[in-house]
C-alpha cells in the first residue's frame, strides 16, 4: 500500500476502503486521520507500506519527508527520517526520497522511514558520489528551449513571439518585467504548456508566491507539472519556507544531471517576504528594504545556470513594476542586471487588449547567438530593424498580424523573404 496513492484518493473512496477493513466512525474524521487509521490497520496484518516525499532536515539533525500536494507544509502524515539514515546516504534538504515506512509506535506521532529505495529517482548508492551544486561549473545557456508548438492556435502566437523576441535556453535566468494587469500570469501559463508539450524530459515546477487562491487552482489545472503555492493569506515565513524547499529540490535534481525549469510568480513578492522575515540589520534602503533582505532572493535567482557537468536549472521569474510602491521599484532595480534574458510587458499594449503585451524593442537575450542558428539569427535581426522605428503598440499589432497568417516561425520568415 502506498501513502501517496491514499493521499490522492477522494475522501468518499477512503471511507469505503476503511469500512471494508472493519474501521468505524470514519465519516466524522479528517482526511489525514482516516489515512492514518487505514495504514495502522494495514500494518497490523503485516503488509508493507511505501511512501515518498521531499526531505526537509531540521536543526536537531533529523528530518521529515514533506508532501508536494500540501506545498511542503508540515502535516500529521509527514514521514520521520532518522539522523543515522541522513548520514548514511549523505542526504540533504531537497532530496526526493521514496522507501518503505512503518506506522507510529506507542507514544510516537509520525510514520517513520524504514528503508530507502530511491533518492532523486535514482539508486541510493549513486547519491553518495554526486558533485554538490555549489561545485558545479556554470556556463552560458547554449541549448534552446523552443516554445513554438506549431499548431497554429492563438495560444501558440505568444510562444512564437517569445521565440523571436527573447529565445530561452536551458539554464536561462530570465526576468519578465510586468506592470499590473499586463497578462503575466497567462504568459507564464503559456510558457509552462509549451515546455510540457515540447520538452517532456525537463522537470517543470511552478512556484506561486503571494498569489490569489483561484489563480493557484487555475494553474494546477492547466499545467502538467508540479505547482507549489503560498497564497497571499499565508504569513511571510511560509512564503520563504516554500521557496527554499523548491530551490533545494531543484538543486538536488541538477546534481543528478536533470534539466529543471522553475517558473516563479513573482520574485518581487518573494523579496518582500524575505524583507519581513530577515532580522533587522539597522541599515534600511529606500522604500523600507533592509540592506540584508535581498541577499537570499538573489541567491534563489542566481541559482539558475547551465552546468558543464550535465544538467541545468532555468528560472523564469516575474518582477512587478509601476505598482506605486517604492519598495517594488528598489527590488526591481536590484534584480535588473542579474538576469541574462529580459522580457518587458507593456501596460499600454494590454490596455488596448492586444495580447501578448510584449514590448518587442526592449526585450532580448544575452548571448542569443549561442541559442540560434546563424541563418535564423540573421532573420531575427532583420525583423528587429523593420520593427524598431514603430511604436510599441504598432510593433506588436504588426507582428501578431503577420504571424497569424502562418503556422510556424519558419513559414513566417519564408513569407517575409518573399515579400
Swiss-Prot record:
Residues 61-66, 78-80, 108-110 are annotated as: RNA-binding 1. GO terms for cellular component: cytosol. The keyword ATP-binding applies. Residues 284-288 are annotated as: RNA-binding 2. GO terms for biological process: DNA-templated transcription termination. The keyword Transcription applies. HAMAP family: Rho. It comes from the Bacteria. GO terms for molecular function: ATP binding; ATP hydrolysis activity; ATP-dependent activity, acting on RNA; helicase activity; RNA binding. InterPro entries: AAA+_ATPase (IPR003593), ATPase_F1/V1/A1_a/bsu_nucl-bd (IPR000194), CSD (IPR011129), NA-bd_OB-fold (IPR012340), P-loop_NTPase (IPR027417), Rho-like_N (IPR011112), Rho_factor_ATP-bd (IPR041703), Rho_N_sf (IPR036269). Residues 48-123 form the Rho RNA-BD domain. Facilitates transcription termination by a mechanism that involves Rho binding to the nascent RNA, activation of Rho's RNA-dependent ATPase activity, and release of the mRNA from the DNA template. Its EC number is 3.6.4.-. Keywords: ATP-binding, Helicase, Hydrolase, Nucleotide-binding, RNA-binding, Transcription, Transcription regulation, Transcription termination. This is Transcription termination factor Rho. It holds the Pfam family Rho_N. Belongs to the Rho family. SUPFAM superfamilies: Nucleic acid-binding proteins (SSF50249), P-loop containing nucleoside triphosphate hydrolases (SSF52540), Rho N-terminal domain-like (SSF68912). ATP binds at residues 169-174, 181-186, 212.
Amino acid at each position: 500500500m502506498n501513502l501517496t496513492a491514499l493521499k490522492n484518493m477522494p475522501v468518499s473512496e477512503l471511507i469505503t476502503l476503511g469500512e471494508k477493513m472493519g474501521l468505524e466512525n470514519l465519516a466524522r474524521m479528517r482526511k489525514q486521520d482516516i489515512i492514518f487509521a487505514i495504514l495502522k490497520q494495514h500494518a497490523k496484518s503485516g503488509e508493507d507500506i511505501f511512501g515518498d516525499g521531499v526531505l526537509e532536515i531540521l536543526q536537531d539533525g533529523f528530518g521529515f519527508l514533506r508532501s508536494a500536494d500540501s506545498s511542503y507544509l508540515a502535516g500529521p502524515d509527514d514521514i520521520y527520517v532518522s539522523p543515522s539514515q541522513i548520514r548514511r546516504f549523505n542526504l540533504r534538504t531537497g532530496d526526493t526520497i521514496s522507501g518503505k515506512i512503518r506506522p507510529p509506535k506507542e507514544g510516537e506521532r509520525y510514520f517513520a522511514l524504514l528503508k530507502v529505495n530511491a533518492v532523486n529517482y535514482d539508486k541510493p548508492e549513486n547519491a553518495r558520489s554526486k558533485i554538490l551544486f555549489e561545485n558545479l561549473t556554470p556556463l552560458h545557456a547554449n541549448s534552446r528551449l523552443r516554445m513554438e508548438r506549431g499548431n497554429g492556435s492563438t495560444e501558440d502566437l505568444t510562444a512564437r513571439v517569445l521565440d523571436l523576441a527573447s529565445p530561452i535556453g536551458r539554464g536561462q535566468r530570465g526576468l519578465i518585467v510586468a506592470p499590473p494587469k499586463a497578462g503575466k500570469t497567462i504568459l507564464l501559463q503559456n510558457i509552462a504548456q509549451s515546455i510540457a508539450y515540447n520538452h517532456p524530459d525537463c522537470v517543470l515546477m511552478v512556484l506561486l508566491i503571494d498569489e490569489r487562491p483561484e489563480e493557484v487552482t487555475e494553474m494546477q489545472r492547466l499545467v502538467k507539472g508540479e505547482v507549489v503555492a503560498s497564497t497571499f493569506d499565508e504569513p511571510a515565513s511560509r512564503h520563504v519556507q516554500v521557496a527554499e524547499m523548491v530551490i533545494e529540490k531543484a538543486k538536488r535534481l541538477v546534481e543528478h544531471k536533470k534539466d529543471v525549469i522553475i517558473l516563479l510568480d513573482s520574485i518581487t513578492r518573494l523579496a518582500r517576504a524575505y524583507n519581513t522575515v530577515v532580522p533587522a540589520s539597522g541599515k534600511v534602503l529606500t522604500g523600507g528594504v533592509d540592506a540584508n533582505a535581498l541577499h537570499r532572493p538573489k541567491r534563489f535567482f542566481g541559482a539558475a545556470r547551465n552546468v558543464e557537468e550535465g544538467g541545468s536549472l532555468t528560472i523564469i521569474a516575474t518582477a512587478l513594476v509601476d505598482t506605486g510602491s517604492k519598495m517594488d521599484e528598489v527590488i526591481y532595480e536590484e534584480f535588473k542586471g542579474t538576469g541574462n534574458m529580459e522580457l518587458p510587458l507593456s501596460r499600454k499594449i494590454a490596455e488596448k487588449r492586444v495580447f501578448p503585451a510584449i514590448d518587442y524593442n526592449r526585450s532580448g537575450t544575452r548571448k542569443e547567438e549561442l541559442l540560434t542558428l546563424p541563418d535564423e539569427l540573421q532573420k531575427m535581426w532583420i525583423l528587429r530593424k523593420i520593427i524598431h522605428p514603430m511604436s510599441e503598440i504598432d510593433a506588436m499589432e504588426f507582428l501578431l498580424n503577420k504571424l497569424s497568417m502562418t503556422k510556424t516561425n519558419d513559414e513566417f520568415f519564408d513569407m517575409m523573404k518573399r515579400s
